[in-house]
């Protein structure tokens, strides 16, 4: 049921693009010595809002075991049940099964300028590309209408479609990080922002983490406690040898100590989705949004690869009618799915990660 208007002719992404090498890019330029790398790492931490006090408290929690893979697991005495009727609103048949009143409430909110879209695009698609270090939002991932389209273009097309249906322009925000901000900004300039008529913002990250050496406790838990496929004898010996070497390295280097013996960018990590809403405050994007739309009340926040997410008037109206601060979208779980899911834990409705299951 998701619809969008994709740009055509000279407004769409060209079939081929010539890109000049980036002098500051990965692997470019002469090698740097350890002192220069340390200075660069310190500079990156300072520029991206590294909080040493929070980092220090996290290290203490990791060393004490308060934060660990094992402590994340629910107690074996926990009662875990499936959700019950009333825990979720079924939208699997599309917004048609929601009330007309919900649609009218949602349409009024959209035309009143009360909604903006925030697309989380700060990641480098490490799992998706196997560690290629790309900017996922800029990837021309699908051929639609005869041309390959990027995630950015598709999401802007959906906001454009909803806005044009109701005669308004919907503000759209893309969150970025130290990994993606420069590339995203340059790309949007090159494609003239896909001629998006509404307000368009980039929300650069203002929090960054410094990687730590893993603890032996967590390594052993991940390898010995969690289920995994057993390999043939020779492959299993090789895997066990590699893991034994990693445990020795963690002990010798210092468990939960800062990981700095690598390229500076490899020592940092984005802090995760939770921090993107506070980032809107820290980097001034929310202030700019409110100056543009003082009546703004609701944000639709979604991952850059959640292609079905768009401002649906009926779903928006259902959220507003509920009077709740947050409405989360969940999908039906299949047996082979990995990740989190919705369940009742000891009678309370919770989103539970698969790693936390007893």
Regions found by a protein language model. Give the residues of each.
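Conserved phosphate/anionic-ligand binding catalytic regions in large, soluble enzymes, centered on
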Residues: 121-127
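Low-complexity, highly charged intrinsically disordered N-terminal segments
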Residues: 1-100, 109
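Domain-scale recognition of functional cores that engage charged ligands
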Residues: 91-119, 133-358
